[in-house]
């Protein structure tokens, strides 16, 4: 089975939720719930409210995503 292409979008962290979950507003205005990717968790990358992040969304559920990059 072929791997589905994920959608990458830029966004801003609005709120911090429990269990390393975040509420992120995307550039197009949609608000999604996102968690930190494994490599960011392993390297102790801190994400705070207001940070610019790159979120990876799957085509199956566009309301949830994974934070894969935090802009400086």
Swiss-Prot record:
GO annotation, cellular component aspect: cytosol
Cystine residue pairs: none
Keywords assigned: Cytoplasm, Initiation factor, Protein biosynthesis, RNA-binding, rRNA-binding
Cellular localisation: Cytoplasm
Native source species: Colwellia psychrerythraea (strain 34H / ATCC BAA-681)
Function: One of the essential components for the initiation of protein synthesis. Stabilizes the binding of IF-2 and IF-3 on the 30S subunit to which N-formylmethionyl-tRNA(fMet) subsequently binds. Helps modulate mRNA selection, yielding the 30S pre-initiation complex (PIC). Upon addition of the 50S ribosomal subunit IF-1, IF-2 and IF-3 are released leaving the mature 70S translation initiation complex.
Assembly and oligomerization: Component of the 30S ribosomal translation pre-initiation complex which assembles on the 30S ribosome in the order IF-2 and IF-3, IF-1 and N-formylmethionyl-tRNA(fMet); mRNA recruitment can occur at any time during PIC assembly.
Predominant subcellular localization, coarse grouping: cytoplasm
Domain of life of the native organism: Bacteria
Name the record gives this protein: Translation initiation factor IF-1
Family of this protein: Belongs to the IF-1 family.
PROSITE patterns found in the cross-reference section: S1_IF1_TYPE (PS50832)
SMART domains: S1
Boundaries of every S1-like domain copy: 1-72
């Amino acid at each position: 089975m072929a791997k589905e292409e994920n959608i990458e979008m830029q966004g801003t962290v609005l709120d911090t939720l429990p269990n390393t979950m975040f509420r992120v507003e995307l550039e197009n205005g949609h608000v999604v719930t996102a968690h930190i990717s494994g490599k960011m968790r392993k390297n102790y990358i801190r994400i705070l409210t207001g940070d610019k992040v790159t979120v990876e969304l799957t085509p199956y559920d566009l309301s949830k995503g994974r934070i894969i990059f935090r802009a400086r």
